[in-house]
């Protein structure tokens, strides 16, 4: 996900404030449509000043706008964290651990209905920033989403209280947070557009083509159940559609995976 820096008082930042307040209501609407706190491993308190500075300079646009005191404060409240595959790090509005920069791995952000059905809103990858794990740091906003680690993940966690304090003190930190929330809102809108207005054949083709493009591999190592969660469908529906793709010679199925054999045909179906 591309990051852009915003200066104090920018029009985009004002739009972001409005987006943050409508985001929660939109997610509640989505939840209507789709009808154990996990421990994290924290290595030793704060990270070293040198490693933190390198990380912040590379991935946080606001770093150059912090005072020396704010930089020291941020470093002392940043930790390296590790999550196992399948581990849940955020349970709706029940917790607020902080802002996480993903060094390596993947997070899945999803809605969970009262009946236990879930739908994936978006995923985050290497070098993305997870802001929704610090939803309590965002004024008057509660994001009722869950976040899982979809693979072994290493990240750098800024404690929620520390990030909130910096947002209150520094407009550039607040603008950075607003930018990410707007990006998340855009991702959610795209997901719901697919679920509401795209046929399952096109949604599945688009997902497979995007995964192939992202990984650079024609072998997609996912179960039918995983794919169903990602595209907001049922496993049985995905399985039937994959069999149709096989009959059209677009893919081949194997145990625990899918091989794309006709990229162009899949691309045309994905649109």
Give the ranges of each region predicted by the language model:
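Cyclic-nucleotide recognition modules
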Residues: 120-178
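Glycine- and acidic-residue-biased ligand/ion/polar-headgroup-sensing regions
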Residues: 97, 101-110, 127
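Short phosphate-coordinating micro-motif centered on Lys-Gly-acidic
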Residues: 89-94
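Polybasic "coupling" helices that flank or enter modular domains
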Residues: 150-152, 168-233
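A cytosolic small-molecule/anion-sensing beta-strand core signal
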Residues: 84-85, 103-104, 125, 151
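Cyclic nucleotide-binding regulatory module and flanking cytosolic helices
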Residues: 39, 43-84, 134-138
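Phosphate-/nucleic-acid-contacting segments
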Residues: 209-271
């Amino acid at each position: 996900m591309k990051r852009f820096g915003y200066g104090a008082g920018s029009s985009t930042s004002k739009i972001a404030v409005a987006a943050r307040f409508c985001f929660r209501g939109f997610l509640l609407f989505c939840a209507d449509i789709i009808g154990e706190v996990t421990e994290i491993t924290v290595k030793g308190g704060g990270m070293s000043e040198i490693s933190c500075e390198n990380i912040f300079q590379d991935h946080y646009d606001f770093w150059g706008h912090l005072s020396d005191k704010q930089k020291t404060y941020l470093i002392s409240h940043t930790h390296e964290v590790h999550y196992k595959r399948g581990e849940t790090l955020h349970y709706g509005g029940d917790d607020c651990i902080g802002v996480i920069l993903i060094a390596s791995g993947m997070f899945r952000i999803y809605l969970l209905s009262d009946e236990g059905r879930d739908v994936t809103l978006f995923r985050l990858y290497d070098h993305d920033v997870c802001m929704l794990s610090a939803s309590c740091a965002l004024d008057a906003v509660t994001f009722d989403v869950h976040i899982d680690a979809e693979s072994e993940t290493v990240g750098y966690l800024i404690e929620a209280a520390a990030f909130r304090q910096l947002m209150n003190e520094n407009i550039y930190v607040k603008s950075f947070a607003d930018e990410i929330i707007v990006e998340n809102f855009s991702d959610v809108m795209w997901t719901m557009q697919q679920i509401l207005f795209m046929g399952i054949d096109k949604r599945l083709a688009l997902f497979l083509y995007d995964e192939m493009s992202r990984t650079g591999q024609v072998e997609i190592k996912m179960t039918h159940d995983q794919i169903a969660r990602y595209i907001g469908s049922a496993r049985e529906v995905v399985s039937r559609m994959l069999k149709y793709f096989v009959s059209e010679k677009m893919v081949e199925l194997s145990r625990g995976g899918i091989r794309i054999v006709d990229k162009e045909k899949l691309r045309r179906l994905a649109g």
